[in-house]
Amino acid sequence: SGSKLPRHKGSAHIGSVALIALAISLAGCAGLPDQRLANEALKRGDTVTAQQNYQQLADLGYSEAQVGLADIQVGTRDPAQIKQAEATYRAAADTSPRAQARLGRLLAAKPGATEAEHHEAESLLKKAFANGEGNTLIPLAMLYLQYPHSFPNVNAQQQISQWQAAGYPEAGLAQVLLYRTQGTYDQHLDDVERICKAALNTTDICYVELATVYQKKQQPEQQAELLKQMEAGVSRDTVTAQRVDSVARVLGDATLGTPDEKTAQALLEKIAPGYPASWVSLAQLLYDFPELGDVDQMMKYLDNGRAADQPRAELLLGKLYYEGKWVPADAKAAEAHFEKAVGREVAADYYLGQIYRRGYLGKVYPQKALDHLLTAARNGQNSADFAIAQLFSQGKGTKPDPLNAYVFSQLAKAQDTPEANDLATQLEAPLTPEQRAEGQRLVQQELAARGTLAQSTLQLHALQEEDGEESL
């Protein structure tokens, strides 16, 4: 992407020439920072080289390089770096439509964002869309679907229908997203298929949606045809490895239909050497279908994933030591692996909380358990609320707290499992009407802090381009 410098009449040309001369004198010809090289390094996953190049260009005032730098910060998923990225995008947003889009997407996906931030996100995304930026309508739709109370005058379905009528390419996917977030996907499989067949050549996330549709409809012939098309796209570089990984995960998901784990394994084996995240997908597949390999194979996959700093590999390895099925149970080893994944994988906090709550390290650590479980719950880990309710009701290593136990058992009812519903009923019985009213107030307060449809932020991430220049 070309660098956009602020334009000043008369001095624009001289200014940019002077900056380039300065860059050469600063870096010497051989080490000249290069936006294109930085973009390519980012696509290869070489964030160190990309960061060095972007940093030098950003220091010279190139707004697009500032955006690239912020993209890397967002990619770390480290809250402190994401905060920094927000400031960087904001600084570049006046001159860079790309920064407007990025900041809009960041604010739309920000946990616990204020109503003012929701409105700022809306205005930025609309502005970026008007400036020709892609991937702006999907997060805008997400904003309307996830925070209806912030936009009481917007009817999401009506808005999406208008976009479709205007022929905007992203409108179809926004419709698919609406089906997903409102739980009506299965009733609209034909519509999802129609939308995604039409958008397949321009939007490779549609391979994932179509694979899902064909699994749910039990249509192996169409699925095979789709995979053939996808492989052709991979060889032409029009389909990313990340998409192939997602499609393989769909094929290996027994909740969608009859799984085809062997095809999933073959797809992942092919891309893993160049796309390390797939080593972990292979390990997960093996975990779900143990007949595909043995413990040595599992460890090979996970070692490859860990060598490429994949937090999902640490999470899965921690899980193996936590459960003790593939390897002997070892709470200390599990804790060490989960700690490496904390801040990057939500479930790591959940498992650490369970280790501390259940006393797997020799004694119960109630405060540590609560800290981790609450973090997990607020980041969308459903089962964490149930574990917190148990922590407060059982009082292991701490005094029982009936009110808080009630609050989190009510939140856990969202899981809709017999255990969660039974616990909620059991904890509600001894409370006075005043305590129940106070409990319900606290439930609403906690839900407001989390934002509605907390899970759908995951959908937003799933629908974002994660490769190179098009990351968040």
Predicted regions, residues:
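Alpha-solenoid helical repeat scaffolds
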Residues: Q55, R90, K126, S161, ...
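Hydrophobic face of amphipathic alpha-helices that form TPR/SEL1-like repeat modules
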Residues: G68-G75, G104-K110, L140-Q146, L177-T181, ...
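Terminal, low-structured helical/coil segments at or just beyond the last alpha-helical repeat
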Residues: E419-L472
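Post-signal-peptide N-terminal segment of Sec-exported extracytoplasmic proteins
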Residues: R36-A87, R98, N135, P139
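Short, low-complexity intrinsically disordered segments enriched in A/P/G/S/L with frequent Arg
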Residues: S1-P6, G10-S11, G15
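Structural signature of tandem alpha-helical TPR/SEL1-like repeats
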Residues: G45-T49, R77-T88, A113-L124, P148-Q158, ...
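Bacterial signal peptide processing site
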Residues: A30-L32
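Short helix-capping/linker turns of helical repeat alpha-solenoids
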Residues: L60-Y62, T76, T95-P97, K110-P111, ...
